[in-house]
Amino acid sequence: DELYAQQIAGYDKIGNIYSESELQNFRPGSPDPFKTVYAEGACAFILETMESAQKRNAEVFGSILSFASYEEPGDFCGANLGSEGFEIAVNDALAKAKTAASEIDLLVWSPRGDAQDEKILNVWRRRFPSAGIVTNVFNTGYIESASTISALAEVLFCLKKGIPIWRQKTGIAEIDNFPLPKSPKKILCAASSHVGNNFAAVFAV
C-alpha cells in the first residue's frame, strides 16, 4: 500500500526495517523472518535477456516488446478521469512494439473499483474491441502498476502451464462475459492512477 513517513518511522523504531548496509546484501528468502523490505506496491518482475535465459535453460514466460508511460499535466489536487493521457501511453507502447491495436489479443489491467476504471474501459471498447480483458483478485490496494504486474504474472503462468485463465469477477456483464482467447500471442498490460500516472507495456507470449 502507500507509504507514509509515520509508518516507516514506526517499523524502524521496532527494528523491522533493513538498514542501507543490510540491503546491499539482501537476497530473496532471507533467513531472518522479522526483517522487512518495505515498498509502495510490493510487486516486481525479475527480468533478464532472452540470450541469458536460454543459456541457463530457464523457462521463458514471455518477452517484453515495449514499455511507455505518460503523466498527465496538472496540479494533482483532484481525480483525473480523462483517458487522453492513458491513450498516449498505449499508443506509444504499441508504436515501440511495432504492433497494431488489432494484434492485441488480451488486455491485462488493474481495476480500482471507482470512476477511474472507465478511462481504461473506454480505450478497450474503442481500440481493442476483440481483445479479452482480465485482472486477478490479488490487487495490492491503490498501487495500480503493482496490481497489474501481479495479474500479468498470473496470466503468463497460466498460459505457460496450460491452466485456464481465471479472472476476477467484476459484476459487470460486459467484462465478465467477454470471451478470453485460448492462446493469446500479444498482451497489453496497462494501468492508470487517479492522479494521472499512466503505464502501458506490450508482451509477446
Where on the chain are the PLM-derived regions?
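Condensing-enzyme catalytic core mediating Claisen C-C bond formation in acyl metabolism
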Residues: E22-T99, E103-L106, S130, K185, ...
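Conserved beta-strand positions
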Residues: L106-W109, C189
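Structural signal for terminal/edge beta-strands and the immediately following C-terminal loop/tail
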Residues: F178-V205
